[in-house]
């Protein structure tokens, strides 16, 4: 997408070339799996003021872009918000209690998990990273899906010296 809007170039490809040229390992960081719940505020609207009741852009669709600078792009590919909000979603502090996909978190759809999986596998295949960091507990979508385990397996099969990092591990996961 960065080739079509924004910088109009493949940013990760530039980093991969630079790392290879300098003899450095390439690391890629992934944060999108929790976009499902973390972007839920984009579905909301103002409760007061002159924009009271006007929904934020997390509810926009590709059709809403006709005649606008983002025509042809689907905001749902960014926000992934075509789903019910999690329990207590209007409480900004609640999201941390739902980090492990529990405590009333709206579980991600199969399509969302598949999209994350496909994009991550594509990045591994294109850029051959040595390190992958997931901003998650254990692996992506743990414990509700084996998607993260399949991604880690793919990296290790492609690069036996590869390293996978997760944000939060307990003693059972180390």
Please identify what each model-predicted range represents:
Residues 1-174:
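Mature catalytic domains of secreted/periplasmic carbohydrate-active enzymes
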């Amino acid at each position: 997408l960065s080739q079509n809007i924004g910088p109009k170039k493949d940013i990760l490809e530039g980093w991969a070339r630079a790392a290879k040229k300098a003899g450095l390992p390439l690391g890629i960081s992934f944060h999108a799996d929790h976009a499902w719940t973390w972007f839920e505020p984009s579905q909301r609207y103002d409760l007061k003021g002159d924009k009271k009741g006007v929904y934020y852009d997390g509810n926009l669709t590709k059709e809403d872009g006709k005649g606008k600078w983002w025509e042809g792009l689907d905001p749902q590919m960014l926000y992934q918000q075509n789903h019910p909000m999690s329990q207590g979603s209007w409480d900004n502090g609640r999201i941390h209690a739902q980090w492990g996909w529990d405590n009333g978190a709206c579980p991600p759809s199969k399509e969302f998990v598949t999209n994350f999986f496909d994009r991550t596998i594509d990045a591994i295949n294109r850029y051959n990273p040595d390190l992958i960091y997931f901003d998650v507990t254990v692996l992506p979508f743990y414990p509700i899906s084996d998607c993260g385990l399949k991604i880690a397996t793919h990296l290790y099969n492609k690069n036996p010296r590869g390293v996978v990092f997760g944000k939060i591990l307990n003693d059972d996961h180390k």
